[in-house]
Amino acid sequence: MLNLSQLGGHALLLRDHRLTVVPLPRLDAREAVERCVAFLDATAGVSAPARTLDERRAAGRTVRETLVWLWEAVAAPVLEALDPPRADPPPRLWWCPTGVLTALPLHAAGDGERAVPDLVVSSHTPTLAALARTGQPQRPTPRRPLIVDAANAHDEVAALTELMPEATVLSGPAATRAAVLAALPRHGRAHFACHATVDPIHREANRLLLADGALTTDDLARHPVDADLAVLAACATGSGSLDLQDEAHHLATACQLAGYRSVIATLWPVTTRQSAEFARLLYPHLRHPTPPALALHHTTATLRSRYPNSPWLWAPYAHLGE
């Protein structure tokens, strides 16, 4: 758990039922807020056609500088204390950030020579209570996947149906709120190719946009499922409300509360082209089967090798859960 206050920053490391406190002297509360605000503006503008070339380049520099700061202020001291063994695959690490740190990609922190994904397979958890639920006995779940396309994501859906011809597809006018809520309990996995709205202040305004309205965080939390995985390939489905200091109430967490054991979500807006490329890379790993966290780790590694100097193209995807 990462704790940040006016008194300073600390990491609480829980390993083998032992708790270790690691001071984070370079983690300053005021600087963290300033960097978070700048980072959110940069990720919104780095690929925006309305921004000038100079503005997009400046946004790209801000993204890269934020990842370096995250490495130096948070990730490096945490990983130095943990000293994870070199292994293939790398060991798992669950990040439990608080405050403004919930909006930042801890899983992608790096200084150009060293980076978190080189050392561990990262997952996020909104609370320690949610983390405690991982690893509990599971019942068999239906393997048939559900694809919800309410964004005319033709390339993405074409890639998905080629990889998963058995999938149920709710597309266009058929992707209604009632149809989606009725279908979710009958499918072990769900892929949402939807637009999303995320309000940085008001949790209740966070929603996936469907054909006839919206699927809200409360809708997801009130309709329990027993399922393996939800993939939220929409804009900023993982970013929480900035006014919540102890818990990330967002669409991805709502899916966890609804019963999805793993959730893959985006922390900032991605384009439809990015989503299609991501789907083509992710799902072959999931077909093996590979645990979702490791499948995302492999997918991110491929994207990182393709776009080494453009972390906004490989770092938005985060895993929550088991």
Predicted features along the sequence, with ranges:
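Catalytic cores of enzymes
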Residues: 1-322
